[in-house]
């Protein structure tokens, strides 16, 4: 998959998974192999909460960025969403990432159960205070195998308004037009770009494995196929950008803040 990304002249790759008990050396090996394919390629990890030693070893192996959403900066709400966890651990992990000089990303879902507007405002202020380089914002979409299965999904309107407010306070941040915004009743990613998002994220995971990572139903990227590079590979992404009066940029996209 990374070789396909490199062939497509993309200079950044994200390795994402659930919070597994990874062998630290396995991730190090992946990072080293990616850097051998292209030493200039930025490697972003999204592997959940990890201890300081793992984060340090992955940084030393060549990782450049790390994504770890706060989900809610309100303590009681965070611990309602994440049973048997406390927000202090998440905050410590974010602090460790910044200390280790990762370009650090965080973010939230909008429309979460028991979330209110004040919480979202506090989250936006939390982003601003911590000067994160990347901020992911998308609507909550319930999965039928979770305790929130019967909760209503978040709206595109609330997610887009949150992106606008976040962009105003964080003018240099990388803000993706998230896959979740493309997975509602229609594709809202162009609207997200118009509201302040500036990143699109094609999924190069092989089709067979991609279908096993259904974190919410009807995930947009499940049916997108970027495994064969051709001049039409990015036609959909080019259209999304064009609809927002933008053009695609395939550089590393290093943060400006």
What are the roles of these predicted feature ranges?
Residues 4-5, 34, 58, 94-97, ...:
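Generic structural signal for hydrophobic
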Residues 5-25, 35-94, 103-110, 133-136:
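Core AdoMet radical
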Residues 19-23, 84, 111-116, 148, ...:
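Short, small-residue-enriched loops and turns at beta-alpha junctions
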Residues 22-47, 85-105, 150-175, 229-246:
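Alpha-helix-loop-beta-strand connector modules within alpha/beta enzyme cores
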Residues 25-27, 56-57, 78-82, 117-120, ...:
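Short secondary-structure transition/capping segments
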Residues 51-60, 112-128, 182-195:
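Catalytic cores of alpha/beta
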Residues 60-64, 84-86, 123-124, 153-154, ...:
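Short, hinge-like loop/turn segments at secondary-structure boundaries
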Residues 128-257:
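Auxiliary Fe-S-binding modules of radical SAM enzymes
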């Amino acid at each position: 998959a990374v070789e396909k990304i490199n062939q497509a002249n993309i200079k950044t790759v994200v390795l994402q998974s659930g919070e597994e008990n990874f062998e630290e050396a396995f991730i190090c090996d992946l990072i080293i192999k990616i850097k051998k394919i292209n030493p200039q390629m930025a490697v972003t990890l999204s592997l959940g909460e990890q201890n300081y030693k793992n984060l340090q070893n992955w940084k030393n192996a060549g990782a450049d960025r790390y994504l770890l959403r706060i989900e809610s900066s309100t303590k009681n709400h965070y611990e309602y969403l994440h049973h048997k966890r406390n927000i202090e651990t998440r905050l410590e992990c974010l602090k460790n990432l910044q200390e280790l000089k990762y370009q650090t990303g965080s973010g939230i879902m909008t429309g979460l159960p028991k979330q209110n507007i004040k919480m979202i405002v506090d989250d936006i202020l939390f982003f601003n205070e911590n000067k994160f380089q990347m901020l992911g914002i998308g609507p909550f979409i319930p999965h039928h195998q979770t305790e929130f299965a019967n909760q209503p999904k978040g709206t595109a309107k609330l997610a887009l308004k949150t992106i606008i407010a976040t962009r105003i306070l964080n003018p240099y941040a990388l803000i993706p037009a998230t896959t979740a915004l493309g997975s509602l009743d229609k594709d809202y990613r162009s609207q997200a770009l118009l509201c302040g998002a500036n990143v699109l994220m094609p999924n190069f995971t092989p089709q067979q494995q991609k279908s096993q990572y259904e974190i919410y139903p009807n995930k947009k990227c499940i049916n997108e196929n970027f495994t064969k590079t051709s001049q039409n590979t990015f036609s959909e992404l080019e259209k999304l950008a064009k609809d927002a009066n933008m053009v695609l940029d395939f550089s590393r996209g290093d943060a400006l803040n």
